[in-house]
Amino acid sequence: MMELKALKPRLHNIMFHTHTVSGIVICFALFVIFYAGAFALFMDELYQWENPNARITTVDASKVDYDKIIEKVKEVHPKFDSTKQFGIVPPTAKQPLSYFYGSEKVNDSTTTRFTAYVNPASYEVNVAGEEPTTHMSRTIYQLHFFRQIPVVGIYLSGLVSFFFLFAIFTGLLTHWKNISNKFYAFTVKGKWKNIWTNSHISLGFITLPFQLIYAITGALFGLSILLLLPTAFLAFNGDTASVIEAINPSAAVKYSDDAKPIEGAFSYNDAFKKVSAENPDYPIIYILSRNYGLEDGTITVNVDDGKGIAANGSFIFGYKDGNTISALIPEKSSYSKSTLNVLIKLHYATYGGLFLKIIYFILAMVTCYIMTSGVMIWRTARNKKTYTDKQRRFHHKVTKCYLALTMSMFPAVAIIFLANKIVPIDLEGRTFYVNSIFFLGWLILLITGLFWDNYSKLNKNYIVIGSVLCLLIPVANGNFTGDWIWRTLINQQYYVFSVDFTAFFIGISGLLLNKYYLKVIDVKTV
């Protein structure tokens, strides 16, 4: 068996206590980040389930008239400003509707953003305003970055990720000597303290690469603005614009406020056909433009096959003549220009298809367990007579708050799925009501859990509640949309079917787990 050299006692104690303190401080927020992020991975796959209007026959993106989409949007939005940045997302099997993001003039000096959904078969435009009609998966995604907290939320998520990286390294150094022994000695039998300790070390070692990816990319995304200045100072003589241009080629394109309008120039259809012909193996995922209709306007086409880590590209064409201004060719990009896209792919698991997302999801759930086992190790180690009753009660309260916050996320996520079906799709301000049901439901579940002093009872209750709610998800979808689980399978609506089936499977599994495995263990709190 491999023998690893241990740290010196003093250094080991420093690393151990640093790992413990940093882990306890960030565990509340970090669990939310990973749990919400695990579901946010499937935003595209959830789209048809949460939006019944998107359950239509998929139209080949190459057969869509994108210039006609622009004209149809202009009819619905007469004040649409084409000189501002606007874009179109072509239809896919996951998202059969075409997205349109644009701006319209409020007055001479003010514009407001809007979102529209276009049926690529009929070119019917459904206006969603500033917020899309369905927001369920995006709410979960925003929770991953704490976007619900104004201004500082994204920075908070970045700081948590940074300290997570710190906790990873201190934990690795702390358990370095015992990693091999604990890994091979792992068992689900024996005392809970030993199970928690062995699994914390073993699973932490197995998921180490995954955790490093998320700690690094999460910190970079959350603290990107704070990292911009030192990067500009060290590598670009203080010029922040040069940093942005090195990473994002489109930022290097300059536009004039005095540009004149021109007619009959390069169009969206022209750009789509040109890129498709030159890159047939790379689907077009987004088309956007700046100063469209003006002599210095541009049209940018982004491609990505969703399989390779560097299999994305970007092509910028001049609106006036269709000449290529910039070309970021897939698999052939420079290091600086591909760095940001690689980080994005690593974080969102968009480089290996659905199977990779499932692996990411499982690893995220394992990471959530690692955090919980760490908290239980911390609490068990302090439930001794060497600590005063006051200290032990404090440790118990911290543990109970952690378990109530984290374990209640299971039924809370089921609640937002149910709310997405219960709240009428055409109700004005629908997003507000769905989100309110989710967060208020989560808050009620959390507060309820604080009254359960027994940890195993708390976990058991949340699993039962969450499992029952999961079983209601396919029922709600069938009742409110008419697309029952068996009908979606027959109609080959596989994305809708997979969500209902997964919810049903989780619900049944949770109830079986509760019946045959989970037992309420009497744990002394002081």
Describe every region a protein language model picked out.
Residues 2-46, 152-239:
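Internal alpha-helical transmembrane segments
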Residues 3-9, 29-35, 39-145:
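Juxtamembrane extramembrane loops of integral membrane proteins
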Residues 40, 44-88, 238-298, 307-310, ...:
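Membrane-proximal low-complexity regions enriched in glycine and acidic/polar residues
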Residues 104-145, 169, 306-345, 368-376:
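Extended, hydrophilic extramembrane loops/domains of integral membrane proteins
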Residues 154-169, 352-369:
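Alpha-helical transmembrane segments
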Residues 169-182, 363-385:
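Membrane-water interface of transmembrane alpha-helices
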Residues 186-192, 381-398, 523-526:
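Membrane-interfacial, low-structure loops and terminal tails that flank and connect transmembrane helices
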Residues 215-261, 389-522:
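Alpha-helical transmembrane segments forming the membrane-embedded cores
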